[in-house]
Amino acid sequence: MQSKLVVAIWTILAIAVASVSAHAAAGAVYTESNSASGNVVYAFNRSEDGRLLSLGLGGYPTGGTGTGSGLENQGALAIDDANRFLFVVNAGSNTISVFRILDNSLSLVEVDSSNGKRPISVTVKRNVLYVLNNGGAVSDVDSIAGFAVSETGHLTPLISGLRLSGASVGPTQVSFNPDGDLLIVTERSTNSIDVFTVDQNGLASGPNVFPSAARGPFGFAFGKRGQVFVSELAGSASAYSVTRSGSLQKISGPIANGQSATCWLVLSADNRYAWVTNTGSGNVSSYTIAFDGTLSLLNAMALDTGSASHPIDIAVSNDARYIYLLTTGAGNIRGYAIATDGSLTPVTTVLGVLPSTTGLVAR
């Protein structure tokens, strides 16, 4: 019954916003249902003014299953550098789905094993993909696995079973650095940050394990000049520098925001601002970033999304003009225009989001 209601809502939305279909899409936004009965990608074309148009009524089936509940993760979906392929984790079936990105739709290429249990986060750089498996949540081990990505989107295993600092560490996100020669994984249960080095063949080694500046390192994003910015469940964010040899050193932090359950983090394209979602408080905080990577709190409540809104994933569009926010408690995706001073102005809201929905990526 719930799935029928969601399809009906998507149908109504598609009719309501059909007027924007006459204009060429400036980009797109993707999320996944994470439904245990069958995972689905929901896709939206983005117009020049930031509004979203639903594509594919009912979404695009991944050929895998989700868990039906939150994954406590960042990066459930990823787009390759050339905007050709969308990669999606299926945490319930231990698989990764590959979609070809078309102008107004998605086409499923294949479904592959994640070479581990409960995949929750995926990252891709050039022709190499890594997935983070939260096996510790299902009596297995936490690990990462790597794949080569062909020109047609086919995945070929490179390495698997590369363990984190322990068997069950509460991993949250895996991501490449901009050069593709490092991977970072956050471990919220051990308050640790793992750094893996990646050779020219895409093979990772490590990890080098470093203590987090505060409790519960969660989401993160790489900036410029070897800088990386991490959100922390304790209600704060910190900045680090990372070297090519895999060494991590704190620049500043933790910088408290006075909010609860600071989880997801995203940067502006010019690396002047960072935004974090405070899931427990129902709001978003903003930070400024200095040239040397030093973080300063800009606005503890840059957005008030509502006490029960449960804001989780957050993404910035490729043209750097818009932020999109997944609020599963409110059952919607919200879009905001980014001002030069880092403030955010509402431009769109899409309804019909399931509580289990996870991941948000924009182009």
Set out the residue ranges of the language-model regions.
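Short loop/turn segments immediately following the C-termini of beta-strands
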Residues: 34-36, 46, 91, 134-136, ...
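Beta-rich, blade/repeat-based domains predominating
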Residues: 63-82, 114-128, 163-182, 212-228, ...
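Blade-level signature of beta-propeller repeat domains, shared across WD40, Kelch, NHL, RCC1
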Residues: 328-363
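Asp-box/WD-like beta-propeller blade repeats and closely related beta-sheet repeat scaffolds
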Residues: 106-173
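A short beta-strand motif characteristic of beta-propeller blades
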Residues: 56-68, 107-112, 157-164, 205-211, ...
